[in-house]
Amino acid sequence: MAPIKVGINGFGRIGRIVFRNAIEHPEVEIVAVNDPFIETKYAAYMLKYDSTHGIFNGEIKQEGNDLVINGKTVKFYTERDPAAIPWKETGADYVVESTGVFTTTDKAKAHLQGGAKKVIISAPSADAPMYVMVVNEKSYDGSADVISNASCTTNCLAPLAKVINDKFGIVEGLMTTVHSYTATQKTVHGPSAKDWRGGRTAAQNIIPSSTGAAKAVGKVIPELNGKLTDMSMRVPTTNVSVVDLTARIEKGASYDEIKQAIKEAAEGPLKGVLAYTEDDVVSTDMIGNPNSSIFDAKAGISLNNNFVKLVSWYDNEWGYSRRVLDLLAHVAKVDASK
């Protein structure tokens, strides 16, 4: 099967990391990028040099208004209106919508006017169907023009919750994500009318915040709808986050039995998305890890056989971006079979 031709709208953190991941993904070829706020020369610089993930492993050039990556031309556009991006002329059948702006079905559908066939939103969506790899992607039937890859935190939590719920049954649970700061936060204390705490200096504070990850898990695993709720703690690290899932389980099990169930899933049906480690890791050890969820066997605890705290790491940039491409490849295969 020839590589799937893909366009990226929005060349921010996720857009660029999706691009870097695509170089390693044999089923995907990025043929076009659109970003109205970046000129081509600067896009090449931003792709080449990354303070978190290092220097791009390959050749990047600029030819006219286009990028040339490892000898292949990537068209570069600066359209503000998604409907005006000429995806068709680039051959891009699928578009990764990573601006964080066009996250509803109606807004993201504008890409179809430019010739795209399907749009994958790299963020949660209020109304587009959400899919998480190894959790519910098999329910995709090809009918939706716009879908969502959910959030990075949902992609970490959902595989872990699936294993625990399938094996032991989750009665109820609380999830906290200890999350690296992101571009929406402030480098110095500044105005943030809708989120006063969020306006405080990102690199100086631990900031309580909200997240919709648990609610989204209820959408991709309907049996858990209403059983989980969550919060976030934004912390002064640039990348890598960690999920703390505290749950009451129906079928009693020792912590060792729970660890074994997760290990078997990570080495079996969930391999490549869920990982398992007994090493004494810290957050920077997870930079560039392509898994969505890396269960830390030594970090968890249990109070008794029905009450347990589970800890799982995730590179909220790299691992999430890899899943965007995996979902895209899955969607393309389903579409091709129709």
Swiss-Prot record:
It comes from the Eukaryota. Its main location: cytoplasm. The record marks H179 as: Activates thiol group during catalysis. One of its GO terms (molecular function) is glyceraldehyde-3-phosphate dehydrogenase (NAD+) (phosphorylating) activity. The active site is at C152. Its EC number is 1.2.1.12. Keywords: Cytoplasm, Glycolysis, NAD, Oxidoreductase. NAD(+) binds at R13, I14, D35, R80, N316. InterPro entries: GlycerAld/Erythrose_P_DH, GlycerAld_3-P_DH_AS, GlycerAld_3-P_DH_cat, GlycerAld_3-P_DH_NAD(P)-bd, Glyceraldehyde-3-P_DH_1, NAD(P)-bd_dom_sf. It is found in: Cytoplasm. Pathway: Carbohydrate degradation; glycolysis; pyruvate from D-glyceraldehyde 3-phosphate: step 1/5. D-glyceraldehyde 3-phosphate binds at S151, C152, T153, T182, T211, G212, R234. It holds the Pfam family Gp_dh_N. One of its GO terms (biological process) is glucose metabolic process. It catalyses: D-glyceraldehyde 3-phosphate + phosphate + NAD(+) = (2R)-3-phospho-glyceroyl phosphate + NADH + H(+). SUPFAM superfamilies: Glyceraldehyde-3-phosphate dehydrogenase-like, C-terminal domain, NAD(P)-binding Rossmann-fold domains. Disulfide bonds: none annotated. PROSITE patterns: GAPDH. Homotetramer. NCBIfam families: GAPDH-I (TIGR01534). Belongs to the glyceraldehyde-3-phosphate dehydrogenase family. This is Glyceraldehyde-3-phosphate dehydrogenase. It comes from Colletotrichum gloeosporioides (Anthracnose fungus). The gene is GPDA.
